[in-house]
């Protein structure tokens, strides 16, 4: 819990530090987002699928383990 609080405080300082130097909030937020992430790229990724997405993959059973206790494989 102490670590989580410390991380939150450091994130708040990291985000608000440029504001104390005369920066605008919009510039600070834009600095947190990578340059290659644009609204056009996000929309394109939502509407267009890669060719590998259309390939039907065989269903592979997934084993779910609880506390390192796994069911036997079939």
UniProtKB/Swiss-Prot annotation:
What the record says about family reads: Belongs to the conotoxin C superfamily. Consomatin family.
Q: Which residues form the propeptide?
A: 23-57
Question: According to its UniProt record, where is this protein located?
Answer: Secreted
Q: Give the protein's recorded name.
A: Consomatin Gh1
Protein origin, superkingdom: Eukaryota
Record remark: domains? The cysteine framework is C-C.
Q: Which residues carry this modification: D-tryptophan?
A: 67
Molecular function terms in GO for this entry? Answer: toxin activity
Signal keyword on record:
yes
Name which cysteines form disulfide bonds: 65-70
Please give the tissue specificity annotation from the record for this chain. Expressed by the venom duct.
Q: What is its main location?
A: secreted
Q: Where is the signal peptide?
A: 1-22
Misc: This peptide is an evolutionarily optimized stable analog of somatostatin. In addition, it adopts nearly identical conformations as in the somatostatin drug analog Octreotide. As this drug, it contains a D-Trp at the same position, whose synthesis is a common strategy used for enhancing the metabolic stability of compounds in drug design.
């Amino acid at each position: 819990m102490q670590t989580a609080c410390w991380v939150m405080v450091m994130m708040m300082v990291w985000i608000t530090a440029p504001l104390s130097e005369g920066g605008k909030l919009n510039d600070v937020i834009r600095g947190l987002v990578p340059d290659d992430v644009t609204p056009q790229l996000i929309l394109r990724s939502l509407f267009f699928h890669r060719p590998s997405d259309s390939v039907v993959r065989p269903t592979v059973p997934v084993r779910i383990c609880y506390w390192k206790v796994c069911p036997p494989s079939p």
